[in-house]
Amino acid sequence: MIKRETQVDQILKDIRGIVNQMVPREAKITEIEFEGPELVIYVKNPEAIMKDGELIKDLAKVLKKRISIRPDPDVLLPPEEAEKLIFEIVPKEAEITNIAFDPSVGEVLIEAKKPGLVIGKNGETLRLITQKVKWAPKVVRTPPLQSQTIYSIRQILQSESKDRRKFLRQVGRNIYRKPEYKSRWIRITGLGGFREVGRSALLVQTDESYVLVDFGVNVAALNDPYKAFPHFDAPEFQYVLKEGLLDAIIITHAHLDHSGMLPYLFRYNLFDGPIYTTPPTRDLMVLLQKDFIEIQQSNGQDPLYRPRDIKEVIKHTITLDYGEVRDISPDIRLTLHNAGHILGSAIVHLHIGNGLHNIAITGDFKFIPTRLLEPANAKFPRLETLVMESTYGGANDIQMPREEAEKRLIEVIHQTLKRGGKVLIPAMAVGRAQEVMMVLEDYARIGAIDAPIYLDGMIWEATAIHTAYPEYLSRRLREQIFKEGYNPFLSEIFHPVANSKERQDIIDSNEPAIIIASSGMLVGGPSVEYFKQLAPDPRNSIIFVSYQAEGTLGRQVQSGVREIPMVGEEGRTEVIKVNMEVHTIDGFSGHADRRELMNYVAKVRPRPERVITVHGEPQKCLDLATSIHRKFGLSTRAPNNLDTIRLR
């Protein structure tokens, strides 16, 4: 370790020599240090660098590093003074709603209803803010819905700024350590989510680095730890955790089967490194993780982890936008690309060993446009191995066309409301809920739906997070929000359910209603309570719009089971008779169906040498792998959990 520190110090010494030659003296450099995947140059006079628009680019080109210029902490105005000055500089018409300081990066976030007025003509107002307060301003439009999750994350990052900076410096020194070995081999090991859906975890190993992609929990199998959690018993994984060798964890998206076990690692001090993901994924996975342990507690179970462990996840997360390239170890470079599955979902591209090998790991993805998101990216700089999901990889897994699915949804709703019934749509709080909301809002606007739409569980909070990241939404939605001035998420037809009393009032009411409630597979959350009480009435309908995993209550109901034993409030088992109509409309899935999966392999560029199918029931993974090999002549594999494949 001492040797590694000495090596990094020498690298920094060499860098300082180059920077001092290229940066004008009036910038007054005070410190140069690696922080996370960036080289940070602290200066007392940032304007001296900013006035030369090409200097940072030239530095990055020479040093082959991502460069960030930050004001020296000593020149930053105290937050109270800086905030007062910002309000004096920015016109009142900008309607600033929030100012948040992040001392760990010397940045001030300014939320305003009219961000253009904060920026000013040709950026004049922004430059004046920088000049006067020294903090680096970041301007965003005020989200129309306030998210408690986003607020609490900002508070944590601000209060933990000193620890955060220390952590980032440790990460930076680890990334830019001198490699002990030249990259010669690459392997991947399935720790979860191979020939199954749930607990996704993939370990990438080189002779220099260890990187984990996803670390999820199978919420449908919590009573069986061997099926619920990734394989901690894998010898190589035990070794990596014990020796503290894991360089990074990358999270493709927020759903618990991909992110749900992250806090567990911090609870038991198994990991202290960086987590890379997109900003929306960070916020959404924190929301889902908190809800997960709250549901466990309400069910009388010991939660897998504590709120303080989720706080550690926040402190250790480094966010990247789509297309940003970052070094995450001496021989691995990461880029995240749109996956089209849920807000912020990403395809992980790993460039290994300076051209030795390139891997794209799709996570969950969708390859057609939806109301909510653009289709998954299929173009990469280089690509040799493609690891892709197979949720709907079976030969007959053809989803209903989206237009037909929407018409069918409205048809079932009309029939149910006409007979005085209620419609229950169990939906994942993140993704399917917002997709269905957009469909219902569109039809309600033209008068095709005339009933209240209730949103229960975390759906409203998740929707608030969606409104905070409009740049991640579909082009059509962005046009509606910014050009047409209409935000469909704010429609009057949506009514968030605040508590259990309101929930019971909706159930007891004689009025027809549409209810969208989490969870999507009926494995906890308010959707289960609605189901219990609405199922016996034949006037009601339940509509499944997303995948129902094996072993879930949702799969039982979907499969036609008409009598289901369930535990009541007093702990007694009661048999629920399912007299309500049961419908499945698969055209709303956030997963690519068989045609999309095959089309993705046909369209992805460059064409990979090898395709590995994961995240699907065994036969679907095998079927997809076989079909890809036959049609495209590519090498394919459908490995099991614990299988290791050498890629190079």
Curated annotation (Swiss-Prot):
Give the family per the record: Belongs to the metallo-beta-lactamase superfamily. RNA-metabolizing metallo-beta-lactamase-like family. FttA subfamily.
UniProt function note? Terminates transcription on the whole genome. Termination is linked to FttA-mediated RNA cleavage and does not require NTP hydrolysis. Cleaves endonucleolytically at the RNA exit channel of RNA polymerase (RNAP); the 5'-3' exonuclease activity of this protein degrades the nascent RNA released from RNAP.
Give the matching PANTHER family. CLEAVAGE AND POLYADENYLATION SPECIFICITY FACTOR, CLEAVAGE AND POLYADENYLATION SPECIFICITY FACTOR FAMILY MEMBER
Q: What is the effect of changing H258A?
A: Significant decrease of endoRNase activity
What are the alphabetically sorted keywords of the record?
A: DNA-binding, Endonuclease, Exonuclease, Hydrolase, Metal-binding, Nuclease, RNA-binding, Transcription, Transcription regulation, Transcription termination, Zinc
Q: Where is this region: Not required for dimerization, required for cleavage at some sites?
A: 1-179
Which note does the record give on the cofactor? Binds 2 Zn(2+) ions, which are required for nuclease activity.
Q: Say which species the protein is native to.
A: Pyrococcus abyssi (strain GE5 / Orsay)
According to UniProt, the name of this protein is: Transcription termination factor FttA
Task: List each coiled-coil range.
Answer: none
Q: How is its activity regulated?
A: EndoRNase activity is inhibited by 1,10-phenanthroline.
Where is the segment annotated Metallo-beta-lactamase N-terminus?
185-395
Keyword Protein biosynthesis belongs to the record: no
What is the name of the gene encoding this protein? fttA
What residue spans carry the region label Metallo-beta-lactamase C-terminus?
590-648
- A GO molecular-function descriptor: DNA binding
Residue ranges of region KHb?
A: 77-144
Where do the annotations place Zn(2+) 2 binding?
D257, H258, D364, H615
